[in-house]
Protein backbone atom coordinates (compact mmCIF):
# COMPACT_ATOMS: atom_id res chain seq x y z
CA UNK A 1 0.00 0.00 0.00
CA UNK A 2 1.60 3.27 -1.14
CA UNK A 3 0.91 6.44 0.82
CA UNK A 4 1.72 10.09 0.14
CA UNK A 5 4.33 11.65 2.42
CA UNK A 6 5.77 15.14 2.81
CA UNK A 7 9.49 15.78 3.24
CA UNK A 8 10.40 18.72 5.50
CA UNK A 9 13.80 20.39 5.85
CA UNK A 10 15.35 19.69 9.26
CA UNK A 11 17.12 23.09 9.36
CA UNK A 12 14.40 25.57 8.33
CA UNK A 13 11.24 23.43 8.66
CA UNK A 14 9.90 24.12 5.15
CA UNK A 15 7.95 21.28 3.54
CA UNK A 16 9.63 21.23 0.14
CA UNK A 17 8.86 17.82 -1.38
CA UNK A 18 5.92 15.42 -1.74
CA UNK A 19 6.60 11.75 -2.43
CA UNK A 20 5.10 8.30 -1.99
CA UNK A 21 6.39 5.31 -0.09
CA UNK A 22 5.43 1.70 0.47
CA UNK A 23 4.61 1.34 4.19
CA UNK A 24 5.05 -2.42 4.07
CA UNK A 25 8.70 -2.17 2.92
CA UNK A 26 9.63 1.01 4.87
CA UNK A 27 7.58 1.35 8.08
CA UNK A 28 10.11 3.82 9.58
CA UNK A 29 10.35 7.49 8.65
CA UNK A 30 12.39 8.30 5.54
CA UNK A 31 15.37 10.70 5.68
CA UNK A 32 16.90 12.00 2.44
CA UNK A 33 19.45 14.65 1.49
CA UNK A 34 17.54 17.06 -0.77
CA UNK A 35 17.96 20.65 -1.97
CA UNK A 36 16.35 23.37 0.18
CA UNK A 37 15.58 26.47 -1.93
CA UNK A 38 15.25 28.74 1.11
CA UNK A 39 18.78 27.93 2.37
CA UNK A 40 20.17 27.38 -1.17
CA UNK A 41 21.99 24.18 -0.14
CA UNK A 42 21.49 20.45 0.31
CA UNK A 43 20.10 19.52 3.73
CA UNK A 44 18.55 16.52 5.43
CA UNK A 45 14.80 16.23 4.77
CA UNK A 46 12.69 14.07 7.07
CA UNK A 47 9.27 12.56 6.50
CA UNK A 48 6.39 14.38 8.21
CA UNK A 49 2.73 13.48 8.58
UniProtKB/Swiss-Prot annotation:
Q: Which InterPro entries match?
A: Ribosomal_bL33 (IPR001705), Ribosomal_bL33_CS (IPR018264), Ribosomal_bL33_sf (IPR038584), Ribosomal_zn-bd (IPR011332)
What GO biological process, any one, is recorded here? translation
Q: Would the keyword Glycosyltransferase be found if you checked this record's keyword annotation?
A: no
A Gene Ontology molecular function term of the record: structural constituent of ribosome
Show the Gene3D superfamilies listed in the entry.
Ribosomal protein L33
Any one of the GO CC terms: ribonucleoprotein complex
List UniProt keywords, sorted A-Z. Ribonucleoprotein, Ribosomal protein
UniProt-listed PANTHER family = 50S RIBOSOMAL PROTEIN L33, CHLOROPLASTIC (PTHR43168), LARGE RIBOSOMAL SUBUNIT PROTEIN BL33C (PTHR43168:SF2)
Among NCBIfam families, the record links this protein to: PRK00504.1, PRK00595.1, rpmG_bact
Q: Which family does it belong to?
A: Belongs to the bacterial ribosomal protein bL33 family.
> What name has this protein been given in UniProt?
Large ribosomal subunit protein bL33B
Q: Which organism is it from?
A: Staphylococcus saprophyticus subsp. saprophyticus (strain ATCC 15305 / DSM 20229 / NCIMB 8711 / NCTC 7292 / S-41)
Amino acid sequence: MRVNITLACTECGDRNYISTKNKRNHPERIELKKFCPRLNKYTLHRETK
